[in-house]
Every structure is written in structure tokens, then in C-alpha cells.
Swiss-Prot record:
Keywords from the named record: Endoplasmic reticulum, Membrane, Signal, Transmembrane, Transmembrane helix
An example Gene Ontology molecular-function term: disulfide oxidoreductase activity
Name this polypeptide is given: Uncharacterized protein C777.12c
A Gene Ontology BP annotation from the UniProt entry: protein folding in endoplasmic reticulum
Subcellular localization, as worded in the UniProt entry: Endoplasmic reticulum membrane
Amino acid sequence: MKINLFFVFLFELLHFVAAYSCEGDESAAIEAMNVLQVPYEKYNTDPVCAFDNSTVVELSDKTWDHVIESGKWFVQLTAEGCANCTLGELLFNDLSHAFHEKYPDVHFARVYLSSSLELSVRLLISRIPSYYFIDNQNFYRVSPQVLPKNKAIALYEKDGFKSMKKEQGFFSVNGPLKSFYWVFGKALALYGHLSQKYTPLGMNVAIFGISAYIMYRSSKKAKQKQAAAAAAAAAKKK
């Protein structure tokens, strides 16, 4: 319990100091780094920029598809209340400023999975924090070890993160099961929302029915597209 309260305190401090911009009070930012026990000199991190998240867009289940549909995005998937996540946020903020100056076409985004259950399923998140570099819907998993800005910039200049693991194959984020992940993520998010209002039995029945309906509609649309494509192909032959 004491450990949990301690991390809550650290995150409250983190968001309080985040009011500083990159031109803010460096001594206050350094003091906060020391309280959080972050070796900013080891990571060559600018303490002030590390607490400034103005160049990072916060996304959620509702905004993800509308934003990450084109362009280059470096995305952090994290949660509140863990030590590794705190360090990851600081390094990610600092990195976003470095990229903003050198490569303004690369956008940075953050997702808090505790309030975005759908994305935790759709993006196959098994550990936090996790990172994706998305280049026009091509997903690359980025290792947290690459996060310090010197390493990240050097790697991006070398091959644009293309040496990172690309998500491809049957079970991947962009694979044939993409629609299933979407449906299951929707169901899980809805389940979490309804769990605050209704009994478990009622929720299970409702979620099952809704999931079955969504899958039926998705299957029906897919068949309609296939039929239309077949008809178009037949018309061309004539």
C-alpha cells in the first residue's frame, strides 16, 4: 500500500512540474528529476523538456482511428502508476522535442491504456510501456532501450526505424485477424464501462449479443464487397 501511494505521489509531482515549458525553470525541473530518482545525465535528457508534454498528443479509443490514419507517428502506450512508465514518459517527452526540431514530420502521441481498453487489445499490448512507430499504417515495434534521444535519433537517421520489428503476418496488428481484435477490443471496453452499472450475468449476455451482432455485420459487409468485386470482374470479361 505504501509503495502504491508513493507512486501516486510521484505521478502527481510529474503532472505538476509538466507546466514548465522547455524555456522554464531548469532548477525546479532538476529537483523534480532528483525526487523521481531519474538519472537524466545518463540518458542525456533535458530536465525541462522532459516535463513538457506539449509536443505529445494524447489519444484514446475514440480518437485513435481519426488521427493515426496517415503520416508518421511515434506512439507510447503506457499507464499511470508504474515506475517504468514514469521514466518512459519523461524520456518520450524529451525525445518529442528533439524530433520536433529536426524532423517535424514525425508526430508523437501517447495512449493511457487504463482508460483505453479497446486499444490495449487491438494493438496486442503485453507489457507497458510499449512503443510503435507508424509510417502510413505500417507498424514497427520499437524497443524501450532505443528511447533515449541520442539512440533514437541515430537509428531514425540510419533507416527510419525500419530495422525495428515490422508487424506482419496472420496474428499481427495489421493481419487477417485485425477485425477480430477490433471487435474484441470494443467488447472489452464496453464490458468495462457497463461493469460499473450492471450485474456480471446481465453484462455477459449483453456483451455476447453485441459482439455477435458486430461480427455478423462485419461478415455481411465483407461478403457484399466480395460479391461486388466478382460482379465487376465478370462485367469486364464481357
